[in-house]
Amino acid sequence: MDGKRRQAPSSGVPPKRACKGLWDEDEPSQFEENLALLEEIEAENRLQEAEEELQLPPEGIVGGQFSTADIDPRWLRPTPLALDPSTEPLIFQQLEIDHYVGTSPPLPEGPPASRNSVPILRAFGVTDEGFSVCCHIHGFAPYFYTPAPPGFGAEHLSELQRELNAAISRDQRGGKELSGPAVLAIELCSRESMFGYHGHGPSPFLRITLALPRLMAPARRLLEQGIRVPGLGTPSFAPYEANVDFEIRFMVDADIVGCNWLELPAGKYVRRAEKKATLCQLEVDVLWSDVISHPPEGQWQRIAPLRVLSFDIECAGRKGIFPEPERDPVIQICSLGLRWGEPEPFLRLALTLRPCAPILGAKVQSYEREEDLLQAWATFILAMDPDVITGYNIQNFDLPYLISRAQTLKVDRFPFLGRVTGLRSNIRDSSFQSRQVGRRDSKVVSMVGRVQMDMLQVLLREYKLRSYTLNAVSFHFLGEQKEDVQHSIITDLQNGNEQTRRRLAVYCLKDAFLPLRLLERLMVLVNNVEMARVTGVPLGYLLSRGQQVKVVSQLLRQAMREGLLMPVVKTEGGEDYTGATVIEPLKGYYDVPIATLDFSSLYPSIMMAHNLCYTTLLRPGAAQKLGLKPDEFIKTPTGDEFVKASVRKGLLPQILENLLSARKRAKAELAQETDPLRRQVLDGRQLALKVSPNSVYGFTGAQVGKLPCLEISQSVTGFGRQMIEKTKQLVETKYTLENGYDANAKVVYGDTDSVMCRFGVSSVAEAMSLGREAANWVSSHFPSPIRLEFEKVYFPYLLISKKRYAGLLFSSRSDAHDRMDCKGLEAVRRDNCPLVANLVTSSLRRILVDRDPDGAVAHAKDVISDLLCNRIDISQLVITKELTRAAADYAGKQAHVELAERMRKRDPGSAPNLGDRVPYVIIGAAKGVAAYMKSEDPLFVLEHSLPIDTQYYLEQQLAKPLLRIFEPILGEGRAESVLLRGDHTRCKTVLTSKVGGLLAFTKRRNSCIGCRSVIDHQGAVCKFCQPRESELYQKEVSHLNALEERFSRLWTQCQRCQGSLHEDVICTSRDCPIFYMRKKVRKDLEDQERLLQRFGPPGPEAW
């Protein structure tokens, strides 16, 4: 609903159709069109009212329960055929793996049943036929390693096990009692730490196997504190791999990756026919050692027909108060279902409170009691049985609201939305904080067996946008606008009639439909499935965890193959290291081609070329102690030492080589593949393989992480700096007049992994040819697989400063540019108002595309003049910034934070929350007032005619971006005098505020419409302008007509967007410029009508 600060659905006019019954559905391909355009069928529906009444459901359905009779059979999963575990294998794609504690049943060739509590892994998935599966995996226990103390032998194992058991039992008193021994086994084995090259090979380690995963933390702590071992005293034990999640540990050992296909061989599993613990169609038990894991290659790359459900709710809030589940009812829940691989939803359902008119293409089910509505949706979820649940802000609003509302109404059977029978869906608060995104508070709703993909959370994590409302992101990615209905208006629609409730249901359906389209368009599901497969973690981890778990999974897999162990490192924020090199830019406007050469996968390539890894790191002085020859190790630019691959091949280089070679294979398959679904999968796979190598480097540099290593990360950036500088030297020494080239080449800029070269040629084709030649020449001077590649040519090129430049980009063809490329400029940034981005973009287009710098200057001066004369629409002046933490946590006063606090005092329900982006404008105030005190809500400004501080926008928003662009062209001193001084800045228009200040104590007096002199009567003109009264009246009427025409056009535009040319516009989308225009024109119309009333009623002569 709009309460989630996003748009309600829009619609339009559908094609006329023959009459259908209430439960009949249109062809799926018509659904979007029907949603877009519904109103033209109103007349036809009224003509067919009698026939419609015959097809309405019986009265008993309103207020009744949602029974299986109300469910379309097409919504249900196919009925599984008889499965004989003794002769038929079970093959399914697993989507989620978790664990629980229970008792183990007897299994073929397995240990006898035990009453002790044991961890049981649970894999949820889907077969090729679409059957849902829950596989209970038995026999796997948690374990970790620790180095054996000096003198420790096999005779000490039983004593240590007894002592550790006793210590854990004492530690667990007062908590959950253990049903058996805490330590199942302690074994001696040979392993080696992965941290550092020691030269002595494997050493004795102890593998400690525990009964339950929750015992890992106390066991690790007690061993670190010291455990008595008879004959050896009380040694302290350093833990290895004790901080690995139980699910990751199992997946590594069983060679299972996220979302891959599992096979249970015939005769190795048992099907649960009775006493099922879940709602899945097929529920089985199997030993972990009997599970066959298929690597996601070839035929095993396919994705099962997953069922995706997208839903949205609407609530009836009170005026001016954001809906609260304790008081405000849920009035509609709309759901759409999609099978992965099919083009259209197979399910469209609107559950409404109170009767609702039919909607073509959707099934409408109405209820008189809210309790029945909620229970009906819960029953529907269990019947439809989705694998993936999506929507927009469902994580922080829809799901928590539904569960809290059901609790308030005591709908006890509602909150069982997962797949485990009798397991309640709970809400818990979660907080995430990082340097990149700040702090985000959110809620987590448990729904075991189903994957939640909240599209809002996906977009916040993956994309940098100016606004994250559903309307804004739909327009950005889908090119669609939609209506935004304020939460207070929703109540009025609900309290209307069947037609207004149908209009609300159409909005709600669109709100459920757009996240589904975003999920498909952005390939969110496919990309995450492939990332889970590449990195080896469960799908849910990608949506709820950070980057490090993906690298840990890959590291553990490679380490296990080589008998290496990952230590547990206690991390604290340590010293930082020098970042990448940026060659000082030669600022200016280049009207010659500039070739860009780029290092392919620079940091991963450096790690592979120089064998940089935990396992190859030498401690200071270790090379001499180990007797290593000079050609057996390297010294990095930062002074750190690593052994070469001839001595030991590093784990990280092996992981990176596997990722890069797998990407080459995936791209080769993608080029040959013709099936659209397989192309999606392969494209998602190559994208995951492209992103993953860079996270390996980031993992080593994370100072607060699982395994930070400053020596690796600083060595990588050290080599990178060295290579950029060497590239500059090589290019500038080879491409010279002395060597027979047309000009002396010059590197005008270099940043991290790329250099921009001016070869002195006049054509793009020549620059491309020299760029390719230079890339091959430079690559020959670096060890494999480091490779410099020709990437593109900029012509012309505007180099402003470090990390700020723009140019026309040529990549493949020399006769036509691909696009205008901007980096670091306000054209692509989102921390300023749209006016800045639009003006910068239009100026750059005139400079680069039109090659007309003078025209760009004239255009910029015109816009500045319009700004100072108050001719710029307020939508162009809105600044948005994210509220990343509470007001008290900011070091200084911030404009958007102070406004959020003021809005909270005005209306707590509509005030922004943590994580929201706050829109504001800067208004005029007394001289010396701080900017943060002048921020105001744009709608409040329009309603109260508050003046805009145009000088602030000129000096603080426009000035610096414009000077950055024009100084390289006009010169530093001249740019400011030309753009920010002169005749175009001398005329200013200031609005008079209706509120605040001295206006509260003043009395307004009328002025003559003709000459503006003060008059002491209520008329329109003074006695001197009386002869011109008719002329002035006609002029004002003409102005009124122009305003009416403008308002009519804007109103019609909004009606088209909402899909109805017959209903009032109720949209309040703050992301839409037309909304602000409509509000402004409406107010101007009211003022103009009041002005005309001063002329008095027309006299008899007018008739």
UniProtKB/Swiss-Prot annotation:
Description of how activity is regulated: Regulated by alteration of quaternary structure. Exhibits burst rates of DNA synthesis are about 5 times faster in the presence of POLD4 (Pol-delta4 complex) than in its absence (Pol-delta3 complex), while the affinity of the enzyme for its DNA and dNTP substrates appears unchanged. The Pol-delta3 complex is more likely to proofread DNA synthesis because it cleaves single-stranded DNA twice as fast and transfers mismatched DNA from the polymerase to the exonuclease sites 9 times faster compared to the Pol-delta3 complex.
Cofactor note: Binds 1 [4Fe-4S] cluster.
Coiled coil regions, renumbered to chain: none
Keywords for this protein: 4Fe-4S, DNA damage, DNA excision, DNA repair, DNA replication, DNA-binding, DNA-directed DNA polymerase, Exonuclease, Hydrolase, Iron, Iron-sulfur, Isopeptide bond, Metal-binding, Nuclease, Nucleotidyltransferase, Nucleus, Transferase, Ubl conjugation, Zinc, Zinc-finger
Keyword 4Fe-4S: yes
Annotated catalysed reactions: DNA(n) + a 2'-deoxyribonucleoside 5'-triphosphate = DNA(n+1) + diphosphate
InterPro entries in the cross-refs: DNA-dir_DNA_pol_B, DNA-dir_DNA_pol_B_CS, DNA-dir_DNA_pol_B_exonuc, DNA-dir_DNA_pol_B_multi_dom, DNA/RNA_pol_sf, DNA_pol_B_thumb, DNA_pol_palm_dom_sf, DNA_pol_type-B
Zinc finger (CysA-type) stretch: 1008-1025
Annotated residues for binding of [4Fe-4S] cluster: 1054, 1057, 1067, 1072
Alphabetical GO biological process terms: base-excision repair, gap-filling; cellular response to UV; DNA biosynthetic process; DNA replication; DNA replication proofreading; DNA synthesis involved in DNA repair; DNA-templated DNA replication; error-free translesion synthesis
GO CC term, one of those recorded: delta DNA polymerase complex
Intervals of motif Nuclear localization signal: 4-17
Domain of life: Eukaryota
Main location: nucleus
Job of this protein: As the catalytic component of the trimeric (Pol-delta3 complex) and tetrameric DNA polymerase delta complexes (Pol-delta4 complex), plays a crucial role in high fidelity genome replication, including in lagging strand synthesis, and repair. Exhibits both DNA polymerase and 3'- to 5'-exonuclease activities. Requires the presence of accessory proteins POLD2, POLD3 and POLD4 for full activity. Depending upon the absence (Pol-delta3) or the presence of POLD4 (Pol-delta4), displays differences in catalytic activity.
Quaternary structure and partners: Component of the tetrameric DNA polymerase delta complex (Pol-delta4), which consists of POLD1/p125, POLD2/p50, POLD3/p66/p68 and POLD4/p12, with POLD1 bearing both DNA polymerase and 3' to 5' proofreading exonuclease activities. Within Pol-delta4, directly interacts with POLD2 and POLD4. Following genotoxic stress by DNA-damaging agents, such as ultraviolet light and methyl methanesulfonate, or by replication stress induced by treatment with hydroxyurea or aphidicolin, Pol-delta4 is converted into a trimeric form of the complex (Pol-delta3) by POLD4 degradation.
Homology family: Belongs to the DNA polymerase type-B family.
Domain notes per entry: The CysB motif binds 1 4Fe-4S cluster and is required for the formation of polymerase complexes.
Protein name: DNA polymerase delta catalytic subunit
Organism: Rattus norvegicus (Rat)
Lineage: Eukaryota, Metazoa, Chordata, Craniata, Vertebrata
Gene: Pold1
